Design a protein with these regions (language model features):
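Terminal alpha-helical segments
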Residues: 1-136
Length: 136
């Protein structure tokens, strides 16, 4: 594989696992008993992975991070519209780690959970459009 093929493969992999996180969030949101912290976690994970797919495509290096604003800033170094259009997605950052452990745990409301899902969908749509990838 040449470098471009490797990049394309990695982009596909990031998107594939982002899609799985988003599907898990959707299924959790549709469940009879919504486990809001888990749904929010998967929304954050999906958004993070879509943003990382863009960074890989643009060959912008990034460190291991769950911070959505940090990732948006990196994306904005190539395309400033990321910060303009997706800055509210930073609300997902707290769902990466903080709510996963007992000392910082809280249960997001159903409204917060729906907002997290909408934010993740917006990140998905925006990134896929920028990457010129068509997915439903």
């Amino acid at each position: 594989m040449d470098k471009n093929e490797i990049v394309e493969h990695l982009v596909e992999q990031w998107i594939k696992i982002a899609e799985r996180d988003l599907l898990t969030a959707k299924q959790g949101l549709e469940a009879d008993e919504v486990i809001t912290d888990t749904v929010c976690f998967h929304c954050q994970q999906a958004a993070e992975k879509y943003l990382k797919a863009f960074l890989v495509k643009k060959q912008i290096e990034f460190t291991k991070t769950h911070n959505i604003m940090s990732l948006l800033n990196l994306c904005a170094s190539d395309d400033n519209s990321f910060k303009e259009e997706l800055s509210e997605a930073d609300n997902l950052t707290d769902y990466a780690v903080e709510i996963r452990y007992p000392d910082d745990w809280y249960e997001p409301t159903i409204e917060e959970t729906k907002l997290a899902y909408e934010s993740a969908l917006k990140v998905k749509s925006f990134v896929l459009k920028k990457l010129e990838i068509s997915k439903e």
